[in-house]
Curated annotation (Swiss-Prot):
Self-association state and partner proteins as the record states: Part of the 50S ribosomal subunit. Forms a cluster with proteins L14 and L24e.
Name of this chain's protein: Large ribosomal subunit protein uL3
GO molecular function: rRNA binding; structural constituent of ribosome
NCBIfam families listed in its UniProt record: L3_arch (TIGR03626), PRK04231.1 (NF003261)
Organism: Methanocorpusculum labreanum (strain ATCC 43576 / DSM 4855 / Z)
Length: 333
């Protein structure tokens, strides 16, 4: 019988409580020195299928051969740039300087309270006057869930996305050029690239320590104490309190998680190429642009997911994969 093993459950994610909102938030962005561009996008998870593609991984046993790869389908209709927000830095850290809002934001009436007057010209002058102190240029973009048949919501999801590349003036000018317009994901990422996928996981509610942390069920005499699914010990005699590392019952799921370096297998516009017979379970048919991501991603169907340029990419050669077949078989069993 094995007497020594790693502790049950990871200590990397604490406190294990529910996320504050359904829209994931990024605290960091990758470095980029090229032409100004957006570093993120968002879509809605439709479901999973599989593709048959040519294995282009160097020195792989199946290099050059057909392999079956599971993929996640994300529906990505165009997003609209609602505002520009610039940050300056002082002794207390970064804080917003001002914002430039676009006109005709009736679509956001259910999400924010619109100001009676739009002082975009005054805000633009203020930013240009302090452009030497600007450290970050962000844009506020919102999704269009009304264009999706699989997502039963009307209110857009509003989020902040970083503009990277070039000087602060170049980034601000680029943000002004796309203010109030629709942006497509194809202008940001391409097939074969790697991206970070962030979402809010499935909520499991209040769960015990066995399911939440994977602790071992108590056996023999200990199981007959009617505490078969309890932790074996709450800790030592001293210190005289239960430490936070002890597996305890509590909230499980509905937490923000990021998966790094997920490969983009395909970006397309014709949804008939990937819609399975009968549609995706708990979602339906994809009717807009879509992206296929290798592997699984956090969250259930219909859940908003954010896509960011890879932060831990390293130096890897980018090449578009050769997809020979996309499964259209029914997912209903």
């Amino acid at each position: 019988m094995r007497t020594v093993r790693p502790r049950a459950g990871s200590l990397a994610y604490y406190p294990r409580k529910r996320a504050k909102g359904i829209v994931p938030k990024y605290q960091s962005w990758p470095e980029y020195n090229g032409q100004p561009m957006l570093q993120g996008f968002a879509g809605y998870k439709a479901g999973m299928t599989h593709v048959i593609m040519i294995d282009d991984h160097k020195k792989s046993p199946t290099e050059g051969k057909e392999v079956m790869v599971p993929v996640t389908v994300i529906e990505i209709p165009a997003m609209t740039v609602a505002a520009i927000r610039v940050y300056v830095k002082d002794t207390y850290g970064k804080h917003p300087l001002t914002e430039v809002w676009a006109e005709n934001l009736e679509a956001l009436s259910g999400r924010i309270t619109k100001a009676k007057t739009n002082n975009a010209a005054k805000a633009t002058e203020k930013i240009n006057a302090a452009i030497g102190d600007v450290v970050e240029v962000m844009v506020l973009m919102y999704t269009k869930p009304t264009e999706l048949t699989g997502v039963p919501k009307k209110v857009p999801d509003l989020m902040e996305i970083r503009v990277a590349g070039g000087s602060a003036q170049e980034r601000f000018d680029y943000a002004l050029s796309i203010l109030g317009t629709d942006v497509d994901m194809k202008s940001l990422l391409s097939e074969g690239q790697f991206a970070d996928i962030t979402g809010i996981t499935k909520g499991k509610g209040f769960q015990g320590a066995v399911k939440r942390f994977g602790i071992t069920l108590r056996k023999r005499k200990h199981a007959r104490t009617k505490k078969e699914r309890h932790i074996g010990t709450l800790g030592p005699w001293t210190p005289h309190h239960v430490r936070w590392q002890v597996p305890m019952p509590g909230q499980m799921g509905f937490q923000q998680r990021t998966e790094f370096n997920k490969r983009i297998i395909k970006i397309g516009e014709n949804a008939d190429e990937i819609n399975p017979a009968g549609g995706f379970l708990h979602y339906g048919l994809v009717r807009n642009n879509y992206v296929l991501i290798k592997g699984s991603i956090p969250g259930p169907a219909k859940r908003l997911v954010r896509i960011r340029s890879a932060t831990r990419m390293g130096e890897q050669k980018i090449q578009a994969p050769v997809v020979e077949y996309v499964s259209l078989q029914s997912k209903q069993g």
